[in-house]
Swiss-Prot record:
Name of this protein: Protein transport protein Sec31A
Organism: Gallus gallus
Location in or out of the cell: Cytoplasm; Cytoplasmic vesicle, COPII-coated vesicle membrane; Endoplasmic reticulum membrane
A Gene Ontology BP annotation from the UniProt entry: protein transport
Domain of life, per lineage: Eukaryota
Length: 1227
């Protein structure tokens, strides 16, 4: 778009790249006059200020000159650093003089601005250029083949590059080589260019166009390649730009023909060698890629010619153009908006006229009434592709899954004599792993879960633990997978049964000894202690005690039996008497109250037991209310089983004792709640140390959610290893809970889901996509987790189970593959598209859908197997991506015959109207009058209607060698061959024998014999008459071609109808084309003869080369199932290319490739290819599916270079053609 504008008819020169700010010098042109016809000349310097939105450029200085200029350049000689203007302005005058100006003095306003000047040339100096390696060297060219090399340090005596070229002519262009400093080129209007070597002082190469119509108006060296240059032609009869390589000067390397009239000036960008500016008499300014000839940008200009065009050295996106209308314009190739330009025009009009009548009446103008117009496009588009200076030389970006995507723009290597091929840009995808320890621990956890080695895993963690708390946690987790877990928990809390028993025994022995010491001073009475036998002295205290009880019981029994003693029942008024009276009357409650009143607690408890459970409970309460000791609360809880009170009221320092009591006495239904209650107290009321112990309570309770919450509070969860610590404990605890409690294994709380999502993100960032998907919660509707699951599934190439794909911001409509248009004259009925996507789910597929792997129609559809393990034990599986199927119907022939269930491959649009090879079958060649309807292939599938069986779709297709073309030569083949059955002789049935709905198009081919008159007298046909094979192409197929061998079993007996059209209702038409159902029977064609093709011109007499060979029935084997994808992928790719190709030559190549790939399919049927070739072909298919055709070509080259030529020579060349065309067409 246009940035600035100067109203001058002048030559131009940009300040060097080192100069800042940017200046533009203009000198009055010697070739034109301005609108005022002034003969004055001047030299001006303007400053480029892009921050100023106006179109005007600021004029810094003006120098009135006595010369007009043919060429003006600004050299970097004697440049100084900083913002001071420096360098030297070099001008070529009209009188043969070369003048050096000091731009700093011009801006300063000095009068003596000329550094030096010489008039050695005869005639105007039209060509000037500065050597970019030695900036003190300047080349100039003028009339009579004069070329001088000036040294700015010694400007007095110039040198010549050699003898003048003959014949003498004007020098219109001159340019120094951009790579070699001693090479100079000059060109003349006659079309000849001369390359000079200053070291030899002679011309080394002369380049000229053979048609002698080149009038050179521009010359430029390639910025990167030393041997290439371009020449522009001013001749309207040959408005071209020729690109030459000096190593091959016989003809141009490339010719750019974008202009319609002569080219006046060219300029090659030093910042990007793919940008070449050109302006011509067609009033166009074009920016082209000289390496490919493509026009990248056309500047919006007016209808005026431009005679000079230049790039800005400092800002490569800016250029200037001087036109014959007296304006010098500054443009940008990066696009922009033109609203400011239109506003400037409006402002200029307003400032000129104001709001008054311009005709002197002094009256204000009425408002201008204009019809409403649509606003023009105000945005100017930039280049088609970014220039090199804004392209990143390298780039890197992290993608999902921890992959680092990098690229680099390598400099292309120029090869002599070879057209520059499109540069291949490579993108490198690397897996970046930053947390190796994290991944190693995650792998160990997954292995433990998969092998269910939880005990050994926990024991390993216990051994590796350095902190006591970490060791306790893993010890508690380990107990969950062992028997008698509560006893093991007690042991971990310090309560071992064996140790406690030993302590009690020791305490009893100590008490016994104390009692024995007291008996030495006081003899026991007979009533207090029974006599001990001497033999009992060695017994233990317990045995002694039990023995005494037995003896007492025995003695009492003997006493009752031998002699009954009497006792007194006192009913006095004291406490004993009252108790006696209460007992005699059965009033246990009063008796207990009396005992409690008299502080006889043991008697009260014993009587309460006799009085029943209710009385015992009340007595226990009264007892506990009166008796206060250190263990009373504990005894109370033991007796009343009120452990919630203990958990809520115990001292938190005794949390271990409280947890031990819960482990010993709590019922299974209250155990988890009591552990949670104790954990909540520790977490909310305790200090930092006690808060960490709450995790042990939650582990005992199996409360994963609270364990996550507590751990998140007491631990640093910001590092990956800290999160790994938590996930290890969570996963192990969840597995323990699933084993010991009847809980939903998929139930996940919000906090746990968040942690699992973070963990899955970390795993995915390290490249463990499968593991991340395993740890991700399965049954949550949180948007972040749903999105992450979708991304993980897509990264693995599948869709989440029970979830539809998340829709993109825009809908991408897939183009149906393998779909041919209907034949002229046909009206296709309602058909399903050739490509439909089905996904296994609850809904049955449409009729005719063949489930993958379903051989028995009654068998249920197979589903993809789930992974061997899953952190959530999710039920169901994730189905794979929906597969592509061709909607088809499979039919059975004959009553009671079962249908053949074979998935039909997608029907490719015929490229040459060749029939596909029919499937092998032994069904009769005729259609029975009544056909059974096949059973549904899927439960709930509707039965197909009988009307779907039509004569066009019921007969098998002819063999692939029988190619019939109806129409003029060159017309594309149609799909009629897929719908029409064969006649008795292997040809199409006559038009009169077909139903009216099937008579399509002209029936005579390009080389068919004239049609016989129906009224002609019929001749008797002999019985052994052999009808000839119709000619179907200009040249017969060779005998060795497997495609030319037709399957021809013996002819049907006379009287057997080979074609019985089914009666159709009025207005009904048989569906034709490649979407009609096809029968699986073979084509019945009588034997015939073949005419082999011989070498020679088409149509030449063949002579005695005709042979009558009997044909045999040849049945091709099916392609193995694992290699069928090769055929479908290659055919689908060819069809996409055919749809995108526009030129006939490309289509012919693709048609030929489609035929010759049959050699590959035959080798696949015979399984004669080596495994390396087959594996390489499958890799090519993968690259085609990802549209990475460059990778496919690399694989192709590897296969060809490493395999036997005889194996691949039949099909690999055409496969390369297909890949190249696909890459070129971008399908």
């Amino acid at each position: 778009m246009k940035l600035k504008e100067i109203d001058r008819t002048a030559m131009q020169a940009w300040s060097p790249a080192q100069q800042h700010p940017i200046y533009l010098a203009t000198g009055t042109s010697a070739q034109q006059l301005d609108a005022s016809f002034s003969t004055n000349a001047s030299l001006e310097i303007f400053e480029l200020d892009l921050s100023d939105p106006s179109l005007d450029m600021k004029s810094c200085a003006t120098f009135s000159s006595a010369h007009r200029y043919h060429k003006l350049i600004w050299g970097p000689h004697s440049m100084t650093a900083g913002e001071r203007v420096s360098g030297v302005l070099i001008a070529g005058g009209e009188n043969g003089n070369v003048i050096l100006y000091d731009p700093a003095k011009i801006i300063a306003g000095d009068t003596e601005v000329i550094i030096a000047q010489k008039d050695k040339h005869t005639g105007p100096v039209r060509a000037l250029d500065v050597n970019m390696f030695q900036t003190n060297l300047v080349a100039s060219g003028a009339n009579e083949s004069e070329i001088y090399i000036w040294d700015l340090n010694n400007f007095a005596t110039p040198m010549t590059p050699g003898a003048k070229t003959q014949p003498l002519e004007d020098i219109s262009c001159i340019a120094w080589n951009r790579q070699v400093q001693h090479i100079l080129a000059s060109a003349s209007p006659s079309g000849r260019a001369t390359v000079w070597d200053l070291r030899k002082n002679e011309p080394i190469i002369k380049v000229s166009d053979h048609n002698n119509r080149m009038h050179c108006s521009g010359l430029a060296w390639h910025p990167d390649v030393a041997t290439q240059m371009v020449l522009a032609s001013e001749d309207d009869r040959l408005p071209v730009i020729q690109m030459w390589d000096l190593r091959f000067t016989s003809s141009p390397l490339r010719v750019l023909e974008s202009h319609t009239r002569g080219i006046l000036a060219i300029a090659w960008s030093m910042a990007d060698s793919e940008l070449l500016l050109s302006c011509g008499k067609d009033a166009k300014i074009l920016c082209s890629n000289p390496n490919t000839g493509e026009v990248l940008y056309e500047l919006p200009t007016n209808m005026q010619w431009c005679f000079d065009i230049q790039w800005c050295p400092r800002n490569p996106a800016i250029l200037s153009a001087a036109s014959f209308d007296g304006r010098l314009r500054i443009y940008s190739i990066m696009g922009g908006s033109t609203d400011g330009l239109r506003q400037k025009h409006v402002d200029q009009l307003s400032s000129s006229f104001g709001n008054l009548d311009p005709f002197g009446t002094g009256q204000p103008l009425p408002p201008l009434q204009l019809p409403q117009q649509t606003a023009p496009q105000s945005v100017v588009l930039p280049l088609k592709k970014p220039p090199k200076w804004i392209r990143r030389p390298v780039g890197a970006s992290f993608s999902f899954g921890g992959k680092l995507v990098t690229f680099e723009n390598a400099k292309p290597q120029q090869q002599p004599g070879i057209d520059q091929q499109p540069q291949h840009h490579y993108v490198y995808v690397s897996q970046v792993v930053t947390e190796k320890e994290f991944l190693a621990r995650s792998t160990q956890l997954q292995e433990a879960v998969q092998s269910e080695g939880f005990v050994s895993y926990c024991q390993k963690k216990v051994d590796m633990a350095q902190a006591d708390f970490e060791r306790n946690v893993w010890s508690f987790l380990k107990v969950n997978f062992e028997e008698d877990s509560r006893a093991k928990y007690l042991e971990l809390l310090g309560y071992r049964k064996d140790d406690l028993k030993n302590k009690i025994t020791s305490a009893l022995n100590l008490n016994k000894e104390c009692c024995a010491d007291g008996e030495l001073g006081e003899a026991p009475t007979e009533s207090d202690v029974p006599l001990l036998n001497k033999g009992d002295e060695g017994q233990t205290a317990e045995e002694h005690f039990l023995g005494e009880r037995a003896k007492d019981s025995k003695q009492e029994t003997e006493d009752l039996g031998s002699e009954r003693k009497t006792f007194n029942i006192s009913v006095s008024g004291d406490v004993d008497g009252l108790i006696t009276q209460a007992l005699l009357t059965g009033n246990f409650e009063s008796a207990v109250d009396l005992c409690l009143h008299d502080n006889r607690m043991a008697d009260a408890i014993i009587l309460a037991i006799a009085g029943g459970q209710e009385l015992l409970s009340r007595t226990q309460e009264k007892y506990f209310s009166k008796i206060q000791s250190k263990i009373t609360r504990l005894i109370t809880a033991v007796v009343t089983k009120n452990w919630k009170e203990i958990v809520l009221s115990c001292d938190l320092q005794n949390w271990r004792e409280a947890l031990a009591a819960v482990l010993t006495y709590a019922r299974p239904d209250e155990f988890a709640a009591l552990c949670d209650l104790l954990g909540n107290r520790l977490e909310s009321e305790g200090d930092s140390l006690l808060r960490t112990q709450a995790c042990l309570c939650y582990i005992c309770a199996g409360n994963v959610e609270k364990l996550v919450a507590c751990w998140s509070k007491v631990q640093d969860g910001n590092s990956p290893l800290s999160l790994q610590d938590l996930i290890e404990k969570v996963v192990i605890l969840r597995k323990a809970v699933q084993l010991t409690q009847a809980v939903d294994p998929n139930a996940v709380g919000a906090l746990l889901a968040e942690k699992m999502s973070q963990y899955a993100n970390l795993l995915a960032a390290q490249g463990s996509i499968a593991a991340a998907l395993t740890f991700l919660p399965a049954n949550t509707d949180q948007p972040d987790i749903v999105l992450l699951r979708d991304r993980l599934c897509r990264a693995q190439g599948e869709l989440p189970a029970g979830q539809e794909a998340i829709k993109a911001p825009y809908e991408r409509q897939p183009m149906p593959k393998d779909r041919a248009g209907p034949v002229a004259g046909q009206v296709p009925g309602p058909q399903a598209s050739a490509q439909q996507y089905y996904q296994q789910g609850d809904k049955p597929p449409p009729p005719g859908f063949i489930m993958p792997g379903a051989i028995n129609p009654s068998a249920p559809p197979q589903q993809a197997t789930s992974p061997s393990y899953n952190m959530y034990s999710q039920a169901g599986t994730r189905p794979a991506y929906p597969q592509t199927y061709q909607t088809t119907q499979q039919y059975s022939f004959g009553t009671g015959e079962t249908a053949l269930y074979q998935p039909q491959q997608p029907v490719a649009a015929p490229a040459s109207a060749s029939y596909p090879s029919p499937a092998s079958n032994t069904n009769p060649p005729y259609l029975p009058a009544a056909q059974p309807v096949p059973s549904p292939l899927y439960p709930g599938q509707p039965q197909p209607s009988p009307t779907s069986l039509n004569p066009a779709s019921s007969f098998p297709p002819p063999p692939s060698g029988a190619s019939f073309q109806h129409g003029r030569p060159g017309l594309p083949a149609t799909s009629v061959a897929y719908a029409l059955p064969t006649g008795p002789t292997g040809t199409l049935p006559a038009a009169s024998d077909l139903p009216a709905s099937q008579r399509t198009g002209p029936q005579n081919g390009w080389n068919d014999p004239p049609a016989l008159n129906r009224a002609a007298k019929k001749k008797k046909v002999p019985d052994n008459f052999m009808p000839p094979v119709p000619i179907t192409s200009p040249i017969m197929n060779p005998l060795a071609d497997p495609q030319a061998q037709m399957q021809q079993p013996p002819a049907a007996p006379v009287g057997t109808p080979s074609f019985q059209p089914q009666q159709l209702s009025t207005g009904q038409q048989a569906p034709l084309g490649p979407y009609a159902p096809q029968a699986l029977g073979p084509c019945v064609v009588p034997p015939t003869t073949f005419k082999p093709r011989t070498e020679g011109a088409p149509g030449a007499p063949i002579g005695n080369a005709i042979q009558a060979l009997p044909t045999e029935k040849i049945t091709k084997k099916p392609i193995p199932e694992e290699h069928l994808i090769l055929k479908t992928t290659f055919e689908a790719l060819i069809q996409r290319c055919l749809l995108s190709a526009s030129d006939p030559q490309t289509k012919r190549k693709l048609d030929d490739a489609n035929k010759r790939l049959e050699f590959l399919y035959d080798k696949l049927r015979e399984q004669t290819l080596s495994p390396a070739i087959v594996s390489g072909l499958h890799n090519i298919v993968k690259s085609i599916e990802t549209r990475n055709y460059v990778e496919g070509l690399n694989i192709h080259m590897h296969i060809v270079s490493t395999s036997n030529f005889s194996e691949t020579s039949a099909f690999m060349p055409v496969l390369k053609v297909v890949l190249i065309q696909a890459n070129k067409l971008g399908v």
